[in-house]
A protein has these predicted regions:
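Short Pro/Gly-enriched beta-strand edge/turn motifs at strand-loop
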Residues: 72-76, 125-128, 150-158
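Acidic, His/Gly-rich catalytic cores of divalent-metal-dependent hydrolytic chemistry
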Residues: 145-192
Length: 192
């Protein structure tokens, strides 16, 4: 099974179209989306694509909470869908539990972690539960941290608003005998 992890699309339709073509070409049927669908140039169009694609499992980002500026352009069904996206959720894949979050539990705008032992501990204390992997976004930087009490922290970077104008995301290859993570950083016009 191959699973994609994305975050921080920020309404970038070109990046979303490229990504959807990539996952179709590579037979990826599950997308763990860590929030911030909205924002940018085409937030409503991006939201509609993700809302209607059953491959996407979503959590809410800080931009998704700020739907007030789009209120006149959304249908009631779309408003309800956005308001009902959870801030966190645990997904079980091949008996491995993944906590999905965008940022901090009490404030989605806070920086999740600063990659120090103390800030990681505070970040993980936000979320109680039995999970092995913590998937988070918000910083737009890819990272893999695997040293805190056996938990692995993964940030896929930003699909639509990266600092180097490339699409960034992660792929998990998972089955009974294999588990590995690939970080992808692709130019929009690339054929990777």
């Amino acid at each position: 099974m191959r699973v994609a992890i994305i975050s921080d699309l920020h309404g970038n339709l070109k990046a979303l179209d490229f990504f959807i073509n990539y996952i179709e070409k590579n037979k990826i049927n599950i997308v763990l989306n860590l929030g911030d669908i909205l924002g940018g140039l085409s937030p409503i169009e991006a939201m509609r694509i993700i809302k209607n694609d059953e491959r996407f499992i979503n959590v809410c980002g800080n931009h998704d909470e700020d739907l007030v500026f789009l209120d006149d352009e959304l249908s009631n069904d779309e408003k309800i869908w956005l308001r009902n996206i959870p801030k966190s959720r645990v997904v079980n894949l091949y008996n491995k539990k993944f906590l999905m979050v965008h940022s901090r539990k009490d404030n989605n705008r806070d920086i999740p972690i600063l990659y120090t032992g103390e800030s990681i501990e505070k970040f993980l204390m936000d979320y109680e539960g039995d999970f092995e992997y913590v998937l988070f976004g918000h910083t737009h930087y890819q990272c893999l941290l695997s040293f805190y009490e056996g938990k692995v922290l993964i940030n896929p970077g930003s699909l639509g608003l990266s600092y180097d104008n490339k699409i960034s995301f992660a792929i998990i290859n998972i089955n009974k005998n294999e588990f590995n993570i690939e970080f992808k950083k692709i130019d929009y016009e690339s054929e990777d």
